[in-house]
Amino acid sequence: MLITERKYFWSGRIAQSRSEANLVDMEAGKLSKSCNITECQDPDLLHNWPDAFTLHGNNASKVTNPFWNQLSASNPFLDDITQLRNNRKRNNISILKEDPLLFFREIENGNSFDSSGDELDVHQLLRQSSSRKSGRSKSVSELLDILDDTAHAHQSIHNSDQILLHDLEWLKNDREAYKMAWLSQRQLARSCLDLNTISQSPGWAQTQLAEVTKACKVNHQGGSVQLPESDITVHVPQGHVAVGEFQEVSLRAFLDPPHMLNHDLSCTVSPLLEIMLGNLNTMEALLLEMKIGAEVGKDPFSQVMTEMVCLHSLGKEGPFKILSNCYIYKDTIQVKLIDLSQVMYLVVAAQAKALQSPAATIWDYIHKTTSIGIYGPKYIHPSFTVVLTVCGHNYMPGQLTISDIKKCGKNISPVVFQLWGKQSFLLDKPQDLSISIFSCDPDFEVKTEGERKEIKQKQLEAGEVVHQQFLFSLVEHREMHLFDFCVQVELPNGEPVAQFCITTPDPTPNLKRLSNLPGYLQKKEEIKSAPLSPKILVKYPTFQDKTLNFTNYGVTLKAVLRQSKIDYFLEYFKGDTIALLGEGKVKVIGQSKVKEWYVGVLRGKIGLVHCKNVKVISKEQVMFMSDSVFTTRNLLEQIVLPLKKLTYIYSVVLTLVSEKVYDWKVLADVLGYSHLSVEDFDQIHADKESEKVSYVIKKLKEDCHTKRNTRKFLYELIVALLKMDCQALVARLIREAAVLTSAVKLGKGWRELAEKLVRLTKQQMEAYEIPHRGNTGDVAVEMMWKPAYDFLYTWSAHYGNNYRDVLQDLQSALDRMKNPVTKHWRELTGVLILVNSLEVLRVTAFSTSEEVWK
């Protein structure tokens, strides 16, 4: 079986060269495992000239860019090609069909104006001035217009052998539309041009793409065609076409459903799907399989009054008719397509036969999913826009073109955003929603007037796709880094519907400077690249092994000797004197009940003692101590022991420490890498302090991995940071690890915890699980920690920097569960001891009163 696959980004099929495909990394869509896939520039090429294509394909691939001298053939901005388009009309016959070897023919260089957009002469563009926009920065479109104007003087050159597809009838007389189509197909990224050259805000340096279309060429043995990043698949059975013939299948999904299908008795629950076929001489039907965004209610009345239907039309706007050959199981529908046509439009809708009180709309009979997609730029910048997209089905494309972006109060050309994350939730009925976004990182903020957006009930009833924009900006001149922000969806009464967190991509990488810039431009480059703020200088205090000075003590009123030892709990005899680290108390479960405990030290061991079992006395009242010496080193060694058993995300740890530690040498010395010198960073070209810190951390990780039976990465790193007095950073790392480990330990029990913490409804819980469901429609047991982590991360974000309350409330909620995991997993109790000991450790171990709060 042979399936020839291709991707294009406009239904008109604009020609694409191999070099153009290197501008943006594209992921191939998923196909059946049995498919044999080969790339093809145009299906007609294989259909009409299979031998020629095979013969010359290998030779062409030997050249890095075989079209280097002829790429102007697909460039609609050169006047000679524009003139060729107007003068040589060939009744929609592609030149490729007349001369399929045209792509592989070597030609002379001729004039440089026949070059690719990759070869734009930047200096020539810089010398060009626009009378309309002198002194102002130029957009990519304007730069390309300059090239177009320059080419006008050379319209007599290369007046033959130009490659231009004439099957774009609808674009012939609309140059702007053709330009947009060409940019879309070619995936021209603004970031491909030097940002300092075009002086544009880097926040808008995004690839220009249109909706993704998936097309495959399938032979008589059949196969499957799946729309990328979706649950939409067309299955082509064996024998669908005769032996020797091929079927071309093209899929395209539109987020906006037909508005006439959304009213009180009907609502769409899938995107509008366009299926294009190249061969109608068929012998077998096609099978469409897709997931839908709703299920009929389980009650008998809903089952009788409501049905899910697949609607078919030959036009995008209808009229639609119901297809009878449908099968629905839970949230998946299968449709047998018998009456085939060259272009078909299909959409799934829930329809009610009638409404009976108290039902007001079709929504009362179904459980409808509403999805939110978070879109943003490929890289973040000091100021960037996040687009929140809301729709009534579960399809969210990987890239989305937004045409109503405004900058400085003016509309700019369409911008393509990348999908950062998505979330689905269930709504009982269409109603107004309030969506707010807030940053979880103090280095970034959301513009005040854009923190909260409203979605109207009418928009949900009409099935509209709603786009809301949120502007993020870097606070002052702080260092750029990825960060997390939270999205909250609420009802008008303030009841939360969905809460989730999104992690941004990395900041934009530094673009390579042009090596051949003139001297005056190089000087300007140096000025522009000057740092925004001076290097942060922090003098870290030295950790001192000093004896702890306790001010509070407790005399035990009874003996406690446990048959089954419990980690982090003290055992004592009646009359023992225990040194207390303070008057603060922690609430944790003991043998069977939740009690209040002091953190104390007895016989050289730190642990918990029940408050009711001791009588607190002052230092002057102490008559006898079993051990009078307990140093800061003893304290540090014991309080960090639970970190050996905590789970962590290495990338998060690496990012946080690299950003918040400002002296790599101090960190290296504390970790035992005092032999490292500046010369060690030359081979990795680490210039920034954060890069050097990152190198030290990676070295620690490698060493701990080599001796993983005796060394623990997180444990050793936290010990080093505490010796540097980086307590705020330590608290952040501990909270991250505790939340993640709790999620892993909880597994499917997270639902019970969510109900106890914030009283989540069943629908809200399902909203956390939907993104992690597998092919069976359920979350696998081994993957259940993911929705648990999503929930706990969102919940903990509301505490801000108050790490003690987060850990205490988490411990209390876990203890209240029917079968508490904390009865046998005590590491969270150990973490509570740690955070309640930090203040005593700091006061005693560091002679300076200066706080290094990072």
UniProtKB/Swiss-Prot annotation:
<comment type="function">
    <text>Acts as a transcription activator for MET and as a key regulator of HGF-MET signaling.</text>
</comment>
<dbReference type="InterPro" id="IPR000906">
    <property type="entry name" value="ZU5_dom"/>
</dbReference>
<dbReference type="Pfam" id="PF23637">
    <property type="entry name" value="SH3BP4_C"/>
</dbReference>
<keyword id="KW-0805">Transcription regulation</keyword>
<dbReference type="GO" id="GO:0005634">
    <property type="term" value="C:nucleus"/>
</dbReference>
<feature type="domain" description="SH3">
    <location>
        <begin position="549"/>
        <end position="619"/>
    </location>
</feature>
<feature type="domain" description="ZU5">
    <location>
        <begin position="212"/>
        <end position="349"/>
    </location>
</feature>
<dbReference type="Pfam" id="PF23640">
    <property type="entry name" value="UPA_SH3BP4"/>
</dbReference>
<dbReference type="InterPro" id="IPR056183">
    <property type="entry name" value="DEATH_SH3BP4"/>
</dbReference>
<keyword id="KW-0804">Transcription</keyword>
<dbReference type="InterPro" id="IPR001452">
    <property type="entry name" value="SH3_domain"/>
</dbReference>
<dbReference type="Pfam" id="PF24094">
    <property type="entry name" value="DEATH_SH3BP4"/>
</dbReference>
<keyword id="KW-0728">SH3 domain</keyword>
<keyword id="KW-0963">Cytoplasm</keyword>
<dbReference type="InterPro" id="IPR056182">
    <property type="entry name" value="UPA_SH3BP4"/>
</dbReference>
<feature type="modified residue" description="Phosphoserine">
    <location>
        <position position="19"/>
    </location>
</feature>
<keyword id="KW-0010">Activator</keyword>
<comment type="subunit">
    <text>Interacts with FASLG.</text>
</comment>
<keyword id="KW-0597">Phosphoprotein</keyword>
<dbReference type="InterPro" id="IPR056181">
    <property type="entry name" value="SH3BP4_C"/>
</dbReference>
<keyword id="KW-0539">Nucleus</keyword>
<protein>
    <recommendedName>
        <fullName>Metastasis-associated in colon cancer protein 1</fullName>
    </recommendedName>
</protein>
<dbReference type="GO" id="GO:0005737">
    <property type="term" value="C:cytoplasm"/>
</dbReference>
